[in-house]
């Protein structure tokens, strides 16, 4: 754990702290329908025109049921829209490589993935999708799925801030304003910055380069439809090919990568994602991309404090998130720096560099892995499947917590607020008082909705993983046995339900069974979790505020900080402890004993 790593970690944390307040203040203006921003002269006419085209009355707010219905309807239409584009790709423009239509099961998986802000990819973008599909089918969802998450967080915060009311905002207004005033302007500047660092942005056909020395590679055997071929034992067949030419990818990459990071989407333009030199050219681009992943989630904690008129509460939530983040990044960094025990027994010194870009090294790989799984981003600059057992445990555990450490844009805050409600409920039980949160009584219905959202996540992950483990279709995708194979399955369904999108890529997921189950897993983890959270918002907004007294439990300071972290670790982690013990924990001890999988 070198000094340079500590310096880079300090720079990252200082930069994150510095952008939190400005981002929070700007979010407050964006999420206020009457708020004014620098972009009003240009964007206000566009905003009003959008409302007219959509037939939306921006002055009419929704109750929680109307808000939920609008969100579900919009997401359904968007999912079908993307599915149709992928199925008709061969008839659509901007397809210089002449890619064919995407298979039905893969098209469903991809449409569900990008609709839910997951961006799980059972395909390689550079060999499957046209420029039109990338821009219109996927980048569209990168914007609106991120805006949807921020809108839901805003609705919950309004419900906490208001009292004796019925409405939590207008979903369509929140969606439009977040997209126009927050995501588009920042992404425009961000994309120009990425181009300045060396990222490509064009519509050229792929460049063909002849290799000086042809090379032999082993690849999965596929049929004419691009589907992998299985042997009699259910394993994927491998064939040897000689490669004499290389296709160098081109296309509108910078514009997609900007929103991919800022919107915590994570889906790579190319299969190698942020480890590819086109998607992440320099150390500076690497740092800025990591900061952009946390930027909106961090700013939302300040927005929370401002809206409830208790800025100390917002900062306490922020500090709790940073503390959990530091715990993860330090464990992952230590595990990867310690290296593989089997290599050490053979006299090979050094940390674990397998699956990592030499230009990023161990620290930046560990930091990026922690950031991308604390948020529901899923972009990677290294291969998580190649991490040590404990190093891989960290991203898996982060996802299973619900990615509430800054989290996906919006999703991180509303996920953490669920734990806040449970924390004050536990505090009330311990002191024998009716639990209160910012003057509002937390009753049985509120706790049920909070717990239901957490149980849906756990059931989606563990239920689908259990099905995969006992079914021939699930086991057919495994290329590793033992605890590591279990970890790969757990990671896949955790990533799906948690709307993360990263993977332990040793699992062959592009099969009809995995495409279907992972697609359902993503939809359940996104929308079935959001409904009880909005129901909680509907309950909180109707409550009266009780004046604070000497016995009121404060929602800022050290006591609340400790209770919140304890609630996150106890309730969030205990659901998955048995499965984690059988996966990465057992693998760690077996690796130390000299056994690999």
Regions found by a protein language model. Give the residues of each.
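Membrane-proximal intracellular helices of multi-pass ion channels
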Residues: 2-597
């Amino acid at each position: 754990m070198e000094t340079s790593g500590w310096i880079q970690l300090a720079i990252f944390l200082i930069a994150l702290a510095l952008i939190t307040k400005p981002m929070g203040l700007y979010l407050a203006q964006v999420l206020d329908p009457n708020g004014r921003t620098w972009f009003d002269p240009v964007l206000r006419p566009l905003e009003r025109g959008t409302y007219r085209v959509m037939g939306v009355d921006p002055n009419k707010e929704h109750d929680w049921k109307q808000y939920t219905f609008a969100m579900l309807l919009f997401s359904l239409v968007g999912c079908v829209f993307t599915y149709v584009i992928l199925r008709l790709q061969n008839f659509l423009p901007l397809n210089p490589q002449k890619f064919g239509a995407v298979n039905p099961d893969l098209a469903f998986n991809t449409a569900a993935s990008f609709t839910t802000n997951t961006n799980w990819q059972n395909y390689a973008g550079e060999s499957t999708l046209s420029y039109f599909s990338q821009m219109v089918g996927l980048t569209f969802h990168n914007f609106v799925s991120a805006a949807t998450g921020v809108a839901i967080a805003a609705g919950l915060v309004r419900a906490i801030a208001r009292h004796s009311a019925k409405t939590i905002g207008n979903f369509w207004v929140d969606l439009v304003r977040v997209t126009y005033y927050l995501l588009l302007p920042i992404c425009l500047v961000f994309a120009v910055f990425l181009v300045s660092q060396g990222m490509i942005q064009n519509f050229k056909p792929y460049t063909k380069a002849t290799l000086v020395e042809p090379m032999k590679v082993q690849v999965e055997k596929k049929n004419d439809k691009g589907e992998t071929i299985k042997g009699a034992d259910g394993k994927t067949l491998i064939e040897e090919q000689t490669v004499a030419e290389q296709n160098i990818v081109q296309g509108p990459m910078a514009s997609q990568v900007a929103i991919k990071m800022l919107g915590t989407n994570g889906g790579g333009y190319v299969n190698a994602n942020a480890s590819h030199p086109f998607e992440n050219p320099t150390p500076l681009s690497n740092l800025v991309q990591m900061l952009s992943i946390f930027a909106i989630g961090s700013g939302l904690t300040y927005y929370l404090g401002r809206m409830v008129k208790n800025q100390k509460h917002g900062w306490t939530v922020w500090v709790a998130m940073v503390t959990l983040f530091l715990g993860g990044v330090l464990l992952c960094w230590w595990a990867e720096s310690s290296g593989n025990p089997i290599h050490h027994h053979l006299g090979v010194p050094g940390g674990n560099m397998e699956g990592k870009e030499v230009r990023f090294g161990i620290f930046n790989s560990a930091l990026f892995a922690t950031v991308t799984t604390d948020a529901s981003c899923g972009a990677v600059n290294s291969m998580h499947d190649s991490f040590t057992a404990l190093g891989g445990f960290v991203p898996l555990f982060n996802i299973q917590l619900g990615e509430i450490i800054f989290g996906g844009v919006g999703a991180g805050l509303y996920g953490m607020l669920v734990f806040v409600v449970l924390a004050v409920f536990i505090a009330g039980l311990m002191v024998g008082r009716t639990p209160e949160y910012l003057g509002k009584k937390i009753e049985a219905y509120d706790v049920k909705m909070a717990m239901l959202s957490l149980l849906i996540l756990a059931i989606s992950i563990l239920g689908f993983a259990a099905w995969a483990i006992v079914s021939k279709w699930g086991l057919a995708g495994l290329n590793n046995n033992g605890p590591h194979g279990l970890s790969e399955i757990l990671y896949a369904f955790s990533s799906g339900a948690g709307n993360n999108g990263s993977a332990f890529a040793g699992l062959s997921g592009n099969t009809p069974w995995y495409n279907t189950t992972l697609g359902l897993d993503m939809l359940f983890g996104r929308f079935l979790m959001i409904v009880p959270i909005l129901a909680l918002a509907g309950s909180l907004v109707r409550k009266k505020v009780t004046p604070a007294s000497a016995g009121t439990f404060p929602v800022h300071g050290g006591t609340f900080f400790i209770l919140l972290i304890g609630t996150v670790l106890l309730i969030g982690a205990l659901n998955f402890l048995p499965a984690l013990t059988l996966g990465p924990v057992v693998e760690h001890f077996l690796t130390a004993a000299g056994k690999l999988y």
